[in-house]
UniProtKB/Swiss-Prot annotation:
GO annotation, biological process: response to zinc ion
Self-association and partners: The complex is composed of two ATP-binding proteins (ZnuC), two transmembrane proteins (ZnuB) and a solute-binding protein (ZnuA).
Gene Ontology MF annotations: ABC-type zinc transporter activity; ATP binding; ATP hydrolysis activity
Family membership: Belongs to the ABC transporter superfamily. Zinc importer (TC 3.A.1.15.5) family.
Cross-referenced InterPro entries: AAA+_ATPase, ABC_transporter-like_ATP-bd, ABC_transporter-like_CS, Metal_Ion_Import_ABC, P-loop_NTPase
Tagged with keyword Hydrolase: no
Listed name of the protein: Zinc import ATP-binding protein ZnuC
Chemical reaction(s) catalysed: Zn(2+)(out) + ATP(in) + H2O(in) = Zn(2+)(in) + ADP(in) + phosphate(in) + H(+)(in)
Location in the cell: Cell inner membrane
Native organism: Ruegeria pomeroyi (strain ATCC 700808 / DSM 15171 / DSS-3) (Silicibacter pomeroyi)
Length: 256
């Protein structure tokens, strides 16, 4: 495995006096795509928040590579419908972003023509891609996505996942994403973590799909049911087709 960009060692997190995560140990390598699945309340989003330093560890630790740049796509982001704000202006909050940098990020997210659109006029898929553009503004070494395809239909989700893979290839960044669907993960995932307050099992999608721990958690009928999102079409979704598909020492991987 390549040198990790981030790692959790014996990490436990408590929220409101309750242990949400217990003894999590996992390392993410440069360029690796890791997908996290698990039931609601299993600690998936909490784990991402701990990785970015938004939650303190009750025990254990998170080790980040020196100079690590992290891009984060949140689970939800509410925009006041009465607040006029263009995509370009949104990307410049809280500090101004040069126009060429914003244009590069939008192109990398697959929506190069949205700069002057109002945020409130975007479709679900367009909105998620703008959030992705914001996350890659500073060319991160690590990209974290919290249920980023929630609310998108299958074609929209598949197209978004394809864009994530392109970002990974372009930037050489590691990707850690939480999947809202227990049984569907991105086809390009190098590793899947099945989480329920702890790591139940991990491995390639094929290994996890057959793991007894996975079947015990989600039912005996789920054996081999961990499906993969693959983009099956040559055309682009959302914008191009006009449809709305959505209601102690580590070194970061260098930019490409």
């Amino acid at each position: 495995m390549n040198t990790p960009v981030i790692a959790a060692e014996g990490l436990s997190i408590r929220v409101d006096g309750r242990t949400v995560l217990a003894d999590i140990s996992v390392a993410v390598a440069a360029g690796e795509i890791v997908t996290i699945v698990g039931p609601n309340g299993s600690g998936k989003s909490t784990f991402l928040r701990a990785l970015i330093g938004a939650l303190p560890a009750a025990s254990g630790r998170v080790i980040r590579a020196p100079g690590l740049r992290i891009g984060y796509v949140p689970q939800k982001l509410a925009i006041d419908a009465t607040l006029p704000i263009t995509v370009s202006r949104f990307l410049s909050l809280p500090r101004r972003v040069p126009q060429d940098v914003a244009a590069e990020a939008l192109a990398r997210a697959g929506v190069p023509d949205l700069a002057n659109r109002q945020m409130t006029d975007l479709s679900g898929g367009q909105f998620q891609r703008v959030l992705l553009a914001r996350a890659v503004l500073e060319r991160p070494h690590l990209l974290l996505l919290d249920e980023a395809t929630q609310g998108l239909d299958q074609p929209g989700s598949a197209a978004f996942y394809e864009q994530i893979e392109e970002v990974r290839q372009d930037l050489g960044c590691a990707v850690v994403m939480v999947s809202h669907d227990l049984h569907v993960v991105m086809a390009a995932s190098d590793r899947v973590l099945c989480m329920n307050g702890h790591i139940c099992c991990e491995g390639t999608p094929e290994v996890v799909a057959d793991a007894p721990e996975y079947r015990a958690l989600f039912g005996t009928g789920t054996r081999g049911a961990l499906a993969l999102y693959r983009h099956q079409h040559s055309h682009r979704h959302d914008d191009d087709c006009g449809h709305d598909h959505g209601a102690e020492h580590m070194h970061p991987h260098g930019d490409r």
